[in-house]
């Protein structure tokens, strides 16, 4: 099962890189968590934009990003002072197959493939240190802390290859 998940992640990362690489953008897959770097770095040198991207894909209702992976993205972004616009992006891909359990057996049902690209701000500097960030299939995002989960509205980032962004109204509790 681990290899399937890992391959799913690599495929999603390569998909993002290949869609980003064009006349204006250059993107590279860096190897991710095993080497202490973001999954992907992308730059637009004409507009001085740098993206540090952490990518997650899966068949469940929720995808999670541990805080250490987000912190690595911020540490890389801080290194590049030349870039006027620097963003840490969490990329989430919910696959067409939704994994469900029936009588302790995994099964799949069909659903629409969706992708979200969320701009993450260094929220833990405001006193909340999350253990991880969670994104649900509907695009809602949450900080997971020792005290529980807090819904937070991270802005969508329009990737250069996206035609439109689906917006969701998120209510704070």
Give the label of every model feature segment.
Residues 63-90, 112-115:
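Short, charged, amphipathic alpha-helix that recurs within catalytic cores of restriction-modification
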Residues 29, 54, 90-92:
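Structural signal for conserved beta-strand scaffold positions within catalytic alpha/beta enzyme cores
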